[in-house]
Amino acid sequence: MNSKALLVFISLCFFFNENCAQNKLDGSGRKSGKWVFQVKDHPSSNYAENLKVEEGNFINGRKEGIWLRYHKDGKTPKLKGNYRNNRPEGFYIRYHRNSKKMEEATFIQNKYKGNCIRYYNNGKVAYKGNYNNSGEESGKIQYFHKNGKFCL
């Protein structure tokens, strides 16, 4: 077998192995391991057919670890965040449709906590703030114009 054919064969093996290793149920019928949800799994999502809506891992039927949600093109990330016991927990990033960051923040017990930065779709900072343990803005809050200059 020539090296090009061998390379194609090995690539196909990895592709099929990856696809077969996702969207599995455990012995109790709960979602387990890596899952990729497509439009058929979210019929009300208004996405075109056969595109990814979101993907991540399940443990005991609950979202755990890093999850990615996609914009309607099925490729551009919309949100990347950590889940713990089926709830957003920890650092996450939301993205504009042009792939630039929209927001960076941390969620603890379904509330903002710590630093939060929001961005315009041109990549310039729109807002910088801090959230206390109750999920309320605290301390110095800053707003910026779309050109990046501080609002007085």
Regions found by a protein language model. Give the residues of each.
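Bacterial Sec-dependent N-terminal signal peptides
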Residues: 1-23
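Glycine/tyrosine- and acidic-biased, solvent-exposed loop/turn segments at the edges of beta-strands
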Residues: 16-152
